[in-house]
Amino acid sequence: MSVSRRVIHHGLYFAVLGPLIGVLFLVLYIFFAKEPLILLVIIQVLPLFILLSITTGAIPAMLTGVMVACLPEKIGSQKRYRCLVGGIGGVVITEIYCAVIVHIKDMASSALFENILSGENLVVRIIPALLAGVVMSRIITHLPGLDISCPETDSLS
């Protein structure tokens, strides 16, 4: 598989599945760390919650996928290092993206965006980005569309 095809597949899969994995872990975090009754409120607004996570997390997730696709073969061929780089890259890219959005006041005009992007809710951004980066880096070679018989993707699994 060519590098450009791998970049496109990784970027799209990360952009589509990454925010959803982040939402799953965030809901579990809220359920176990806060009161379980708050989960009922989240379930009521789950479609808005998912939409918000996709609008704020798709671009950083796509950039993380592109970064993972461009890893050198020595790092990308080992699952442990690929997951480590994917997790750290997810956090760093998400924080840079959120910092850019905060400085562009037009995009962060709503109170909901300002609340999520503020420094007080760092855990709400870091934990989902870290876990989504790790999980997606782990499962990316098993998703459809990637030619598993190709030596370039065999070295990544």
Curated annotation (Swiss-Prot):
Membrane topology (Periplasmic): 33-36, 105-125
Name this polypeptide is given: Inner membrane protein CbrB
Keyword set includes Cell membrane: yes
Domain of life, per lineage: Bacteria
Family: Belongs to the CbrB family.
Compartments, record wording: Cell inner membrane
Keyword terms, alphabetized: Cell inner membrane, Cell membrane, Membrane, Transmembrane, Transmembrane helix
GO cellular component, one term: plasma membrane
Transmembrane segments: 12-32, 37-57, 84-104, 126-146
Membrane topology note: Multi-pass membrane protein
Main location: membrane
Topological region Cytoplasmic: 1-11, 58-83, 147-157
